[in-house]
Every structure is written in C-alpha cells, then in structure tokens.
C-alpha cells in the first residue's frame, strides 16, 4: 500500500513555514535539509520538519495540502503545537551518520 505525506517545515526561527506533499518523506526532508531543491525552502532556509500527516490516498493528501496552504498562520501554529509544542525537528535523527569503532 502506498503512503503519502503532508508536511510542514520551518526555518530555525519558526517565522517561515512551508507546506508540501510527498510519497517519500525521508527523501523529501533530506532534499530540503541538503538544499537540493531550488525555490522557496532553499531561499528561506526551511529545513526543520515540525509536523506531518500520513495518507493512503494521494487525492486526500493533495486536498489536505491545499487546505493547509489556505490556513491562517495562527491555525498552522496551533496544529503544529498540538503534537509538537517545542517545535522540535521530527527528522533530527533520521540522517545521523554512524561511524564504526576503530
């Protein structure tokens, strides 16, 4: 079964948010963190995953993304803070490098 994700990323000051949709959240967040994607998120340094939702239907995911993009900033803040009150980077440990002991 395919999975789709709607996500919100922020810059380190939490004053810029970006909402997106993807079928591979780890890959997409990695692309944002490494600045592999040109455009808004690269320009405003949005690379901190602060919220995401999972869907089994791409159409529902796209509808949710569109809905969130039309929300007021306060509504998005409330959504994020409901599950992530400290605005932690939910992907912080996804890309840690491990080194073998010598």
Regions of interest found by a model, annotated:
Residues 1-38, 42-52, 62-66, 83-85, ...:
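GIY-YIG nuclease catalytic motif and its immediate N-terminal context
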Residues 55:
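Short, surface-exposed polybasic/aromatic micro-patch for ligand or macromolecular engagement
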Residues 58:
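C2H2-type zinc-finger recognition helix
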């Amino acid at each position: 079964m395919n999975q789709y994700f709607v996500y919100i990323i922020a810059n380190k000051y939490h004053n810029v948010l970006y909402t997106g949709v993807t079928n591979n959240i780890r890959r997409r967040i990695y692309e944002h963190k490494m600045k592999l994607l040109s455009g808004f998120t690269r320009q405003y340094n949005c690379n901190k995953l602060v919220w995401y939702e999972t869907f089994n239907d791409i159409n529902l995911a796209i509808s949710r993304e569109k809905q969130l993009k039309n929300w007021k900033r306060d509504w998005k803040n409330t959504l994020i803070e409901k599950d992530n009150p400290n605005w932690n980077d939910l992907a912080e440990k996804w890309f840690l490098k491990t080194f073998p002991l010598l």
